Each structure stands twice: as C-alpha cells, then as structure tokens.
C-alpha cells in the first residue's frame, strides 16, 4: 500500500540583500541589511517514526497475565449487566475467563484458544463450542486470539504502519493509520506516548462499523505501563458497550485453566 508522506512545518524564509559597497574617503559603509534566520523544517516522517518507536517500546511484553476485573456490559439489545471476572492468559496460547454473577456465584467460564471458543453456562448448564470466528460474531470486530489478548493487555490493536496523518496539539499526538480493516486514529500522550484513545472506522466505506477504545488510570507495575480502566464501544447494526476496571493484576506468574464439561450439561 502506497504511503502518503505529509510534511508539517514552516517554509524557511531567506531574506538577504547584497550590500553595495561605496568607497568614499577610504571609509567602508556599514551593511545595515537585516538577515532573517532560516526556520528549520519539521520532518513529519521523523516525528512519526519517533512516536511509533515509543509506542512499540510501551508494548507490554509478557508470558502470562492474570487479573480480577469489574465488567459493565451493555449489549446491542440495550440490556445492561455487571459482573466480576477472573482473567488468565498465556500469550499466543489461551485466554481463560470465569465470570461471577450476583452473590459471587460463577455464571460463565470461557476458554479461548487459537482455533476455538468454548463456553460453560453454569447457570443454565449448557456447554457451547464454536470456532474462533465466534469472536467476530459477538463483537462485530475482526478478532482472533492474538488481537483479543492485545486488547485485554492494553497494547495497540489494528495499528498499521501506513500512517497517513500526523497531528500534535494540546499535549496529544494523533496518528492516523490505514489498514486492511480499519482507519485507526490513535491518540497518544505527548510526553510518554501512552495510549489515550483508539478510534476505528471501517476501511470499507460501504460498511458502517466503528469502534472507540479509551484507556485511562495508568499504573506502572514491574516496569510495565498498564491502563487499569478501559471503555470499548462498537457500533454497526447495534451498539455494544463494555467497561473494564482492573482491580488486581499480575504478569508472568504461574496460571492454570481449569475447564471440564460435566456430563449433565447440554451440548450446544
């Protein structure tokens, strides 16, 4: 894909006049011409490269991750739910989620691998097994295991190297990338390049799919900059809203994924 190179800056103004020397009584006339210094051009591509390097440096590098999360969920049908969940991950391998309903009763257990999504509905005693494409069906986003893990951990998603616009103002850097699925407007804190927002618009103008991801309440643990609050809104035919509040979390500690299907569960 052809890159569009944008240049932001001022054109250097060069003003100079060649002084005319006149010799009168062996006295040289002083050159009174004012020379305006050249204004340095801003290399936008260099600024983009610097920002992307810092974004890459801020990526959380982990082997395992576990967290307790308060989740507020509003589905496309307008119903709202609030649950507490335990999330465990092994990078590039699996995601395990246990969601509790009222009174701390476990309502759902989920296991996501590279090729499948398995769900245990413990309230209704139903077991569901689907292919990984099920993630896209329920979220309207092109999700696989790796992308979902990046979203949970707080790393940038759908960020393409094809940066078509760069902005900087009010302490916020904006990088607009054009990828296969989305135009992604990534908003960064100017100082440390932490992610503030990622606004996604479908790259296909025939589709009306948008998503907005907000990151806030950053903490530093074991050298990793982690956003403890997230807001995700996805709109297509309906609107899906998810808020995540990470209460406790840890990196690179042993994790287990207990997942067994009782014999009396209905298979779906």
Language-model features and meaning:
Residues 1-4:
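Positively charged n-region of N-terminal signal peptides that target proteins for export
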Residues 19, 23, 165-268:
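Gly/Pro-enriched, hydrophobic low-complexity segments
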Residues 22, 94-145:
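An acidic-aromatic
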Residues 57-65, 76-81, 88-93, 206, ...:
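Edge/loop elements at the starts and ends of beta-strands within beta-rich repeat scaffolds
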Residues 13-16:
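C-terminal motif of bacterial Sec signal peptides marking the signal peptidase cleavage site
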Residues 18-70, 76-80, 266-268:
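N-terminal leader/targeting segments and the immediate start of mature chains
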Residues 122-184, 261-267:
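Flexible, processing/modification-adjacent segments and terminal tails
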């Amino acid at each position: 894909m052809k890159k569009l190179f944008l240049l932001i800056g001022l054109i250097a103004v060069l003003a100079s006049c060649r002084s005319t020397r006149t010799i009168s009584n062996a006295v040289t006339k002083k050159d009174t011409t004012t020379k305006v210094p050249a204004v340095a051009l801003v290399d936008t591509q260099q600024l983009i490269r610097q920002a992307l390097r810092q974004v890459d440096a801020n990526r959380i590098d982990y082997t395992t991750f576990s967290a307790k999360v308060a989740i507020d969920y509003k589905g496309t049908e307008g119903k709202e739910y609030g649950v507490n969940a335990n999330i465990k991950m092994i990078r590039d391998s699996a995601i395990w989620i246990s969601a509790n309903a009222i009174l701390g009763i476990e309502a759902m257990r989920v296991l996501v691998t590279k090729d499948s999504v398995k769900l245990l509905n413990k309230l209704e005693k139903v077991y569901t097994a689907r292919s990984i494409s099920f993630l896209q069906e329920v979220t309207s986003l092109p999700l696989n295991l790796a992308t979902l893990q990046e979203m949970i951990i707080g790393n940038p998603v759908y960020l393409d190297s094809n940066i078509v616009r760069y902005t900087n103002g009010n302490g916020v850097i904006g990088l607009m990338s054009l990828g296969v699925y989305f135009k992604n407007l990534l908003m960064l804190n100017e100082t440390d390049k932490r992610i503030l927002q990622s606004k996604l618009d479908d790259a296909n103008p025939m589709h009306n799919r948008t998503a907005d991801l907000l990151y806030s309440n950053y903490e530093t643990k074991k050298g990793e900059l982690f956003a403890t609050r997230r807001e995700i809104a996805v709109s297509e035919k309906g609107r899906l809203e998810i808020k995540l509040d990470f209460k406790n979390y840890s990196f690179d500690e042993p994790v287990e994924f207990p997942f067994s299907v009782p014999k009396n569960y209905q298979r779906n």
